[in-house]
């Protein structure tokens, strides 16, 4: 009996023990590892994973490996090595590892964000980027769409004058409408029940993608009941049902001679492919309804929660740093005033505001460890070999908090992005990649940067944003999910007297 148990354990150890493809090659230093569970028993059990990985660099260096369950994962925590992975060898490392939770969220690896590299991912990324190009000029200009929604946001916030509120949902609505206009040329009215549906499934997907689920680390555990997977499936189904309803309704009014949004772009590509008018890389099987709705779902998921979260982080840091907030008010008053609303061209004048946004993206990156990459081929990072199929994590937190690259990296110091005179934006370090880089970089970076600047500029022009009367400041600890979230908090909204007076003068 005991002999059989021992034999079984030895067999399992052999099957799941990491095997090197190139026995003579030099591999990154590794944490201790055990069969089946890998390095999990030796990883810190408390604190944020990105910070724990950063601390491990002191012992193992800027690149090291861990066994996450049965999978080898290389952790990269230096900008030079990170750029090698993302840019110099971007094709080598453009894959996505297969995980149970990501497979569910991406409808079995469709879409853009979680899809593995290949013809499907390249096609949908190219089509999505082509859509953003539609919004450069004219009536559909991105800035016009953003400002239209921010104006509605500000009008709504003004109804809470003198009150302390959680601005999460109002900002969510504004950002959702920007994405909806880009995807469908439609927006939601306040009170539309679909807004609550979108917010609920977004939160549900983000929450259950980020449970550090053992089934992602040890795939064979999928055979057992799993509450996290069931919850995730439920939220993904709600998302899919809503997007499918939108898609079916849109098919009736689609016009191939009027391409004005992302759904138009995807449907036109499908029509061309079905009619044999597309190139060899545009297979109609890659443009099924399921593929299309997953890509639209990715744009919503990536574009809404991320921007909403960064706006909240920015407000939180300003509440903690009233001296910076005071300078921002002075900058806006001097360079924009109250006779007009801020525009994108004001980025050249509102330098402290732009520096503040950059500092928030450094201190609290949207995704502290990005989305995991996968080696598509046997390759290398620096002097170390990396086998095909290896998962690679870029620890953006480490890049943005390296004391050798950043003076007092844990301190909120927007002025670090300005020259000493405060008259020019600078790049104080090359260890800064808030939107990633290379083939897997964020396709919505331009949109996100415009939204963040305009939302904050409009809010600061119109409102005094203050700590609530109870003195409760936001927590800056954060909640590391797929997106680095901030705990709910309230801010006291007061319409600025100077803005009120300017509006009164303009109406007479």
Curated annotation (Swiss-Prot):
**Principal subcellular localization:** endoplasmic reticulum
Q: Where in the cell is it found?
A: Endoplasmic reticulum membrane; Microsome membrane
Q: In which pathway does it act?
A: Steroid hormone biosynthesis; Steroid biosynthesis; glucocorticoid biosynthesis
Q: How is its activity regulated?
A: Regulated predominantly by intracellular cAMP levels. The 17,20-lyase activity is stimulated by cytochrome b5, which acts as an allosteric effector increasing the Vmax of the lyase activity.
Which reaction(s) does the protein catalyse, per the Swiss-Prot or TrEMBL entry?
a C21-steroid + reduced [NADPH--hemoprotein reductase] + O2 = a 17alpha-hydroxy-C21-steroid + oxidized [NADPH--hemoprotein reductase] + H2O + H(+); progesterone + reduced [NADPH--hemoprotein reductase] + O2 = 17alpha-hydroxyprogesterone + oxidized [NADPH--hemoprotein reductase] + H2O + H(+); pregnenolone + reduced [NADPH--hemoprotein reductase] + O2 = 17alpha-hydroxypregnenolone + oxidized [NADPH--hemoprotein reductase] + H2O + H(+); 17alpha-hydroxyprogesterone + reduced [NADPH--hemoprotein reductase] + O2 = androst-4-ene-3,17-dione + acetate + oxidized [NADPH--hemoprotein reductase] + H2O + 2 H(+)
Q: What is its EC number?
A: 1.14.14.19, 1.14.14.32
Q: Which residues bind heme?
A: 442
| Origin superkingdom | Eukaryota
Q: Cellular component per GO?
A: endoplasmic reticulum membrane
For activity, the cofactor(s) needed are:
heme
Q: Which UniProt keywords apply?
A: Endoplasmic reticulum, Heme, Iron, Lipid metabolism, Lyase, Membrane, Metal-binding, Microsome, Monooxygenase, Oxidoreductase, Steroidogenesis
Biological process, per Gene Ontology: glucocorticoid biosynthetic process; hormone biosynthetic process; progesterone metabolic process; steroid metabolic process
Q: Where does substrate bind?
A: 202
Return one GO MF term: heme binding
* Family, as annotated: Belongs to the cytochrome P450 family.
Q: What this chain does, per the record?
A: A cytochrome P450 monooxygenase involved in corticoid and androgen biosynthesis. Catalyzes 17-alpha hydroxylation of C21 steroids, which is common for both pathways. A second oxidative step, required only for androgen synthesis, involves an acyl-carbon cleavage. The 17-alpha hydroxy intermediates, as part of adrenal glucocorticoids biosynthesis pathway, are precursors of cortisol.
Q: What is this protein called?
A: Steroid 17-alpha-hydroxylase/17,20 lyase
Q: Which organism is it from?
A: Pan troglodytes
Name the gene for this chain: CYP17A1
């Amino acid at each position: 009996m005991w002999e059989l148990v021992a034999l079984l354990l030895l067999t399992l150890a052999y099957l799941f023990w990491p095997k090197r493809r190139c026995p003579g090659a030099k591999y990154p230093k590794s944490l201790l590892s055990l069969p089946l569970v890998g390095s999990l028993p030796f990883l810190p059990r408390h604190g944020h994973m990105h910070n724990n990985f950063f601390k491990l660099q002191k012992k193992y260096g800027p690149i090291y490996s861990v066994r996450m369950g049965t999978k080898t994962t290389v952790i990269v925590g230096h900008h030079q090595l990170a750029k090698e992975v993302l840019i110099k060898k971007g094709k080598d490392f453009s894959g996505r590892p297969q995980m149970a939770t990501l497979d569910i969220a991406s409808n079995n690896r469709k879409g853009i964000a979680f899809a593995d590299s290949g013809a499907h991912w390249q096609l949908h990324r190219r089509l999505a980027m082509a859509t953003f190009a539609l919004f450069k000029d004219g009536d559909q200009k991105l800035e016009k769409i953003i400002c239209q929604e921010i104006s509605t946001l500000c009008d709504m916030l003004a109804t809470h004058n003198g009150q302390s509120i959680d601005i999460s949902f109002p900002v969510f609505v504004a950002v959702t409408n920007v994405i909806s206009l880009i995807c469908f040329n439609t927006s939601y009215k306040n009170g539309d029940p679909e807004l609550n549906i979108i917010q609920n499934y977004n939160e549900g997907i983000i929450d259950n993608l980020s449970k550090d689920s053992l089934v992602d680390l040890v795939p064979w555990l999928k055979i057992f009941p799993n509450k996290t997977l069931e919850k995730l499936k439920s939220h993904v189904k709600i998302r899919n049902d809503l997007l499918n309803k939108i898609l079916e309704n849109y098919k009736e009014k689609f016009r191939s001679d009027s391409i004005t949004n992302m759904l138009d772009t995807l449907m036109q590509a499908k029509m061309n492919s079905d009619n044999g008018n597309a190139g060899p890389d545009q297979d109609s099987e890659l443009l099924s309804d399921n593929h299309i709705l997953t890509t639209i779902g990715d744009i919503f998921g990536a574009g809404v929660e991320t921007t909403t979260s960064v706006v909240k982080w920015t407000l939180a840091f300003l509440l903690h740093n009233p001296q910076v907030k005071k300078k921002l008010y002075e900058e806006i008053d001097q360079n924009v005033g109250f006779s007009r609303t801020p525009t994108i061209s004001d980025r050249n004048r509102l330098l402290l505001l732009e520096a503040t946004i950059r500092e928030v993206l450094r201190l609290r990156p949207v995704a502290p460890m990005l989305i995991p990459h996968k080696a598509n081929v046997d390759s290398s990072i620096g002097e170390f070999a990396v086998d095909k199929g290896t998962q690679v994590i870029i620890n953006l937190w480490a890049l943005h908090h390296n004391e050798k690259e950043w003076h007092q990296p844990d301190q909120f110091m927007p002025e670090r992005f300005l020259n000493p005179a405060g008259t020019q934006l600078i790049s104080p370090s090359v260890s800064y990649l808030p939107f990633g880089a290379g083939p897997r970089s964020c396709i919505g970076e331009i949109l996100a940067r415009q939204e963040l600047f305009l939302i904050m500029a409009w809010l600061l022009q119109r409102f005094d944003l203050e700590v609530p009367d109870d003195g409760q400041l936001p927590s800056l600890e954060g909640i590391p999910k797929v997106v680095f979230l901030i705990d709910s908090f309230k801010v006291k909204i007061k319409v600025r007297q100077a803005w009120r007076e300017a509006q009164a003068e303009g109406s007479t």
